[in-house]
């Protein structure tokens, strides 16, 4: 969806019949008015091109709804496997300067892609698995495989400039130069010009900082001088290497860059506690805007990484605006952890117009009494815990007040691989409104629970509103604890849930139930009204080779998804058997069954041969099914 200021949320709301009273209740913080393009989700000035919709060369569409399949983390449950020297091609529907590629490569490996425009190579990206691939076992997340670990965080992203301007109608090709490669989608963006140094400012360059070099001391000194002289700190174009956590302490400081595509603070340490901004609890009226933050962090350190892009209390009326935050423990964890007599609360924080992606844990968590704060008009994608959360925590020794009146509005939240799209854990008077939550298959779309210690919902007298959200293809059959989670999930463990109002939400193609719960919902606890779901179309599945219908009970992990179209009021989906891409070689061993040779393969996106004499099938594998090809039987197995 492209950014068009002429289409406002007000117009969209009028078309869809949303009342003025509904819109007036979408925020309770003082912040500038944003005109929204859509009823659901954030504005975005980029256009997405799904790899499955592209022209494929030596590449295959991979589709599955199996819980542990790589496809489970892909947009719309499908991606494209591109063989070496294979490619995908598409036509740009509008002009662009930059692109973002979402990809997967095997754990411990690298790959390389070339980008061509109208057949001419203009860009090369080196792809690396090092920030990705975590293994989840209940509460624990590991950096390497475990016996009961579920592989997750298998997709990552890379972005950069084409080096040329891409015009509408140009042909864009992504070619795999080396290694194993899966492509989920490509996003093209018309990038605005870099922002110039503002008035009454000092530049990081004035302190000797240079792009590509360590700038830690320069940044610390520049922050000190900006605070003392009441100047804005401007960070010009470039990637500045930072090898330590940066402390911010004081009122009224503004740090701004040339734009999220131009200015990057790259934290170079992979050690716990050595990256991000740590906000001192006497700070107020802080502004961080128009730059990106990235890091070398690759581990949660058993939930002790202490490596968040932003951590601490931001005091009163602070703002995080137009930042691109990637590869941290969390995007922002907001809360003070001082002793009870010295607690300072975040009040009136605005996080907006930002991209918070591919972090190991939460996107944003408003904790420790944070109030009157809002996250809005942001894209939160590919994170490894709740994408957006408000937790009424009471850390040891703090006696923290309750979180209250926080707002999550008009965010696009997608592809979370663990926990909820949005999580509300206690508190009062919050609003969750007009968000688009899509492909959140690590947990519920929106979860409301008392599973964690802290304030529950006992003080929630005025109610928490969950209105006008759309939840698409979200929920899970297994939350890593053996429980299914619906588009909405309610879990009562350490206190009652009360005064929650779900109204005018839309659920599309939920993975499991619309609502899952561990207690009976009443109007006093959760009032549900005027919610709809849009997944009632009949679906017919067709084998592309035989043109015969496939039973709904068939194991669809034995097939590649080849697209769909709507016909006579139903959706027709096309599937190609995995056996069609398997080539039987003379050296392959086999057994016999009723005069037919039986060959064994793994049930991966790209099946691997399993030799009869070296494989302990019943001990190490689970039988998935079989298909016939050229008079032979291809038997598929998945590793236990």
Residue positions per predicted region:
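Non-cytosolic beta-sheet module surface loops
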Residues: 92-94, 103-107, 176-178, 226, ...
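Right-handed parallel beta-helix
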Residues: 258-261, 284-295, 316-329, 344-361, ...
């Amino acid at each position: 969806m492209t950014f068009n200021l002429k289409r406002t949320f007000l117009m969209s709301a009028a078309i869809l019949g949303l009342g003025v009273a509904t819109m007036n209740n979408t925020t309770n913080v003082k912040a500038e008015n944003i005109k929204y393009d859509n009823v659901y989700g954030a504005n975005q000035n980029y256009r997405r091109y799904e790899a499955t919709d592209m022209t494929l060369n030596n590449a295959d569409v991979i589709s599955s709804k199996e819980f542990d399949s790589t496809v489970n983390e892909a947009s719309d449950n499908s991606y494209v496997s591109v063989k070496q020297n294979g490619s995908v091609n598409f036509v740009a529907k509008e002009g662009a300067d930059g692109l973002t590629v979402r990809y997967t490569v095997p754990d411990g490996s690298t790959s390389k892609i070339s980008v061509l425009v109208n057949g001419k190579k203009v860009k090369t990206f080196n792809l690396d698995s090092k920030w990705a691939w975590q293994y989840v076992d209940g509460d624990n997340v590991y950096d390497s495989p475990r016996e009961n670990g579920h592989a997750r965080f298998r997709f990552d992203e890379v972005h950069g400039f084409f080096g040329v301007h891409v015009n509408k109608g140009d042909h864009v090709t992504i070619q795999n130069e080396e290694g194993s490669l899966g492509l989920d989608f490509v996003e093209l963006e018309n990038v605005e010009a870099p922002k110039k140094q503002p008035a009454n400012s000092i530049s990081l360059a004035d302190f000797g900082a240079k792009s590509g070099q360590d700038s830690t001391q320069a940044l610390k000194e520049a922050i000190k001088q900006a605070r003392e002289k009441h100047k804005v700190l401007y960070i010009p174009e470039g990637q500045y290497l930072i090898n330590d956590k940066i402390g911010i302490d004081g009122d009224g400081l503004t740090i701004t860059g040339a734009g999220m595509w131009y200015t990057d603070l790259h934290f170079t340490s992979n050690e716990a506690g050595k990256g991000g901004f740590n906000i001192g609890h006497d700070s107020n009226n802080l502004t961080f805007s128009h730059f990106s933050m990235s890091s070398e962090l690759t581990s949660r350190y058993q939930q002790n990484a202490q490596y968040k892009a932003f951590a601490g209390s931001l005091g009163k009326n602070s703002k995080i605006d137009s930042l691109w935050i990637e590869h941290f423990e969390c995007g922002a964890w907001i809360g003070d952890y001082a002793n009870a007599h010295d607690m300072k609360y975040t009040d009136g924080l605005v996080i907006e117009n930002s991209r918070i992606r591919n972090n190991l844990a939460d996107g944003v968590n408003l904790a420790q009494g944070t109030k009157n704060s809002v996250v809005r008009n942001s894209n939160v994608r590919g994170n490894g815990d709740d994408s957006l959360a408000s937790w009424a925590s009471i850390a040891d020794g703090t006696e923290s007040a309750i979180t209250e009146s926080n707002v999550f509005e008009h965010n696009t939240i997608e592809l979370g691989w663990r926990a909820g799209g949005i999580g509300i854990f206690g508190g009062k008077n919050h609003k969750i409104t007009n968000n688009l939550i899509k492909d959140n298959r690590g947990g519920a779309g929106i979860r409301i629970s008392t599973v964690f210690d802290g304030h529950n919902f006992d003080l929630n007298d005025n109610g928490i509103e969950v209105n006008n959200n759309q939840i698409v293809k979200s929920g899970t059959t297994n939350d890593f604890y053996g429980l299914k989670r619906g588009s909405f999930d309610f879990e009562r463990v350490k206190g009652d849930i009360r005064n929650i109002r779900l109204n005018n939400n839309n659920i599309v193609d939920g993975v499991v139930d619309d609502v899952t719960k561990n207690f009976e919902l009443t109007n006093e606890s959760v009032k549900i009204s005027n919610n709809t779901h849009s997944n009632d179309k009949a679906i017919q599945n067709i084998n592309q080779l035989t043109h015969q219908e496939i039973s709904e009970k068939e194991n669809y992990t034995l097939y590649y998804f080849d697209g769909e179209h709507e016909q006579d009021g139903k959706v027709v989906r096309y599937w190609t058997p995995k056996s069609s891409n398997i080539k039987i070689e003379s050296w392959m061993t086999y057994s016999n069954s009723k005069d037919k040779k039986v060959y064994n393969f793994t049930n991966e996106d790209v099946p691997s041969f399993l030799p009869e004499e070296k494989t302990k099938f019943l001990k190490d594998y689970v039988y998935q099914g079989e298909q016939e090809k050229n008079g032979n039987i291809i038997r598929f197995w998945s590793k236990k």
